Amino acid sequence: NNRLTVAYNPDAPTPKKWLQFLSELLQPEDIPTLQEFLGYCLLPTTKGQKMLMLIGKGGEGKSRIGLVIRSLLGDSMNTTSIQKVESNRFSRADLENKLLMVDDDMDMSALPKTNYIKSIVTSECKMDMERKGVQSYQSQLYVRFLCFGNGALTALHDKSDGFFRRQIVLTTKDRPAGRVDDPFLVDKLLREKEGIFLWCLDGLHRLIGNNYQFSISGKARENMETVKRSSNNVIEFLQSEGYIRFKADSEASSKALYEAYQRWCEDNAQKPMSANRLSSELAQNERLYNVEATNNVHVGGKRVRGFMGIEVVNPLPY
């Protein structure tokens, strides 16, 4: 039972201090996204299939959002780390019957695994719960993740679109150099609690009206592409010049492509991923790059695996 710790007062005044705080923290086009996400956390559902990251350089005040939301959700909110949710088998049971989990200081090290986080964000079926000294059991979670940090969530091995598709990344404005922080800011914001609740409800109504599709600004889309590129240098390589060329009537063997990729990595001080990773990135994005996987590339009188629609610039001699 998720009883909210706020009264519904349809006549509550507009939360001016809260809106001012948000306007200093976020770009105007990102505020509706936050509003929809906080509204989304009022219902026990995972239909939106997203987690929200608020990324800044530190000291902007973004974690104040977590303190304000705790006052609305009460015991239906839990604070822990996203790393712990993935790696500690007992931590998932602590998320049972919770609407929101806040990680207010996200660990920047890449996640070794992402299976549980992805499953919880979409939560389409029950999962195993373990509590110390208790027989494990199955339960359906509906908790949402809100993370504050100085960089995006990355994974060591999961470079799939599925991992990134579940994230919304908003970046905060920089903290003004001469700003004096108000130690009583949260108390002042909490005086507007009933108005903030109505503001969240407006976001929820908009989200439901939009079939649980969040409003995502161009900037937020760009953030996600940047995170994807920086965690998967294969994408950067495929968008580079001087190593490969996309051309309708050309072809390249997987081996020649991987050698070109290794050259690019060396030139850019990057660590190469496996040859399989390069081939699967191309194969999964055939339409995007206008290429086609084939077993019919001719190399030295043999037929080998490769791709049509791409060629290596200055290939190494066979």
Q: What spans do the regions from the language model cover?
A:
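Feature primarily recognizes SF3-like P-loop helicase cores of small DNA viruses
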Residues: 1-318
